Amino acid sequence: YVIKFFVGRSKPKKTKFVISDLDFNDGTHDVHVDHIIINTQGVHVIETENMKGIIYGKESETEWEQSLEHGKLMKKFYSPIKQNSGHIYSLKKKLNTTVPFFSYIVFTKRGSLAVKTVHVPVEYPFAFSQTIKNKKAHDVLNHDQAEELYHAILALKKN
């Protein structure tokens, strides 16, 4: 849903390659990446969450909390920022590239976000589509290089 939302609103002539549900082994761990967008700015790695309730967390924290039943039930879960950071580390390790990687966390609108971050956007789908569309980063790849990186990432996929 998140990627369809973004891709559907993009200009078709821009260089953009999309991979969803990438499973690979980085040599140590099995890794699942929800979505990757490769464009001329680099590699955008998106972790999606579909949680209800109120989500509390800070960028620096390892555990976040999900408040359910009007605060009567609190569930801890691993920070999606830390999780996505691990995905990016594994991708860089396998690809051996200096291309910039960007991290994004996207929650569906089932819940409310009470999250504080500075470097990693934690947003709903519409805000994410605006964030990535308006991303201020230098182009580091041409179309052919972006396509080559796309195929290199696809080659990591477990059969």
Regions found by a protein language model. Name each.
Residues 1-31, 37-43, 49-57, 63-159:
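Surface-exposed interaction regions that form or flank ligand-binding interfaces
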